Amino acid sequence: MAQASNSRIKVGIVGGTGYTGVELLRLLSQHPHVALTAITSRKEDGLPVADMYPNLRGRVKLAFSAPEKASLTDCDVVFFATPHGVAMAQAAELLAAGTRVIDLAADFRLQDTAVFERWYKIPHTCPDILADSVYGLVELNREAISKARVIGNPGCYPTTVLLGLAPLIEGGKQLVDVQTLIADCKSGVSGAGRKAEVGSLFSEASDNFKAYGVAGHRHQPEIVAQLEKLAGGKVGLTFVPHLVPMIRGMFSTLYARILPQARDTDFQALFEARYADEPFVDVMPAGSLPETRSVRASNNLRISVQRPGGGDQLVILVVQDNLVKGASGQAVQNMNLMFGLPESAGLDQVAILP
């Protein structure tokens, strides 16, 4: 594991113009151990970052540069806030130079290249690097992340579903029926990215609430692969994502049928014990109901454990900011571990209210 030194970590960002890119900039500009070194955008080459994102005035003095002009191999770590396929095309060169890679897209999330190619419709060009990569969900893979050279940063939906279900199934626990799991998830519009699309237009998304990807969503195989790794066997999951008319935030309602032999389990205590030492996972008091606004612009994820009527249906409520714990904040959390830094370095922001 690389150890943090007195010198700052030299950080590059490929694809700094999207929402996850600017969120990385916001977080890293406040990080006590980071020196932002390069931010790439072919289209915005030469444009000062603060001209595009005025919230960064006085914080980020760099200008965007075309990828071929940026000295990414001089960085200690490079974040890819890019479409799928970009990181895998550049990873080998960076790794050869000793630069670590954290990809916020899906290039290193799925270990099965056939599954990746089926869902993302592009060939996987570096299966050897993929085999050495680590799935970057800190609360599940902390030790492996600390030694990793390549991180596949989890998707936003998978983060809520996996952390919401892990205490129930990890280690092959026989507490709930793993064949009938349901994830009913809602995301703010920023989850669709910054590109111009009809479905993200104000007139389309405002005052509207809709499901999408019901027949199949790219995060489904990612979630199932990790659930099966936790459970040690096959898992059945019904996953239905929704788009809600807010900018940022995610609310996932998870359903699990309690097995007869587990009816006397104290599920509140189970979750509290599992996440007692996690700096960014908050298991709320019994009977509490989480709200997306309670995590806005923070790296916190809040979980509420519910058992309506004391019956056999367990309901787990999970909220996070899809751009922070669901993307860029989680990526910074991974970087901290990779370089031997305190896990919460640069991530201690309090959520914004109202």
From Swiss-Prot:
Catalyzes the NADPH-dependent reduction of N-acetyl-5-glutamyl phosphate to yield N-acetyl-L-glutamate 5-semialdehyde. Its main location: cytoplasm. It comes from the Bacteria. Its EC number is 1.2.1.38. GO terms for molecular function: N-acetyl-gamma-glutamyl-phosphate reductase activity; NAD binding; NADP+ binding. GO terms for biological process: L-arginine biosynthetic process. GO terms for cellular component: cytoplasm. Belongs to the NAGSA dehydrogenase family. Type 1 subfamily. PROSITE patterns: ARGC. Pathway: Amino-acid biosynthesis; L-arginine biosynthesis; N(2)-acetyl-L-ornithine from L-glutamate: step 3/4. It is found in: Cytoplasm. SUPFAM superfamilies: Glyceraldehyde-3-phosphate dehydrogenase-like, C-terminal domain, NAD(P)-binding Rossmann-fold domains. InterPro entries: AGPR_AS (IPR023013), AGPR_type-1 (IPR000706), NAD(P)-bd_dom_sf (IPR036291), NAGSA_dehydrogenase (IPR050085), Semialdehyde_DH_NAD-bd (IPR000534). NCBIfam families: argC. It catalyses: N-acetyl-L-glutamate 5-semialdehyde + phosphate + NADP(+) = N-acetyl-L-glutamyl 5-phosphate + NADPH + H(+). The gene is argC. The active site is at residue 156. It comes from Bordetella parapertussis (strain 12822 / ATCC BAA-587 / NCTC 13253). This is N-acetyl-gamma-glutamyl-phosphate reductase. Keywords: Amino-acid biosynthesis, Arginine biosynthesis, Cytoplasm, NADP, Oxidoreductase.
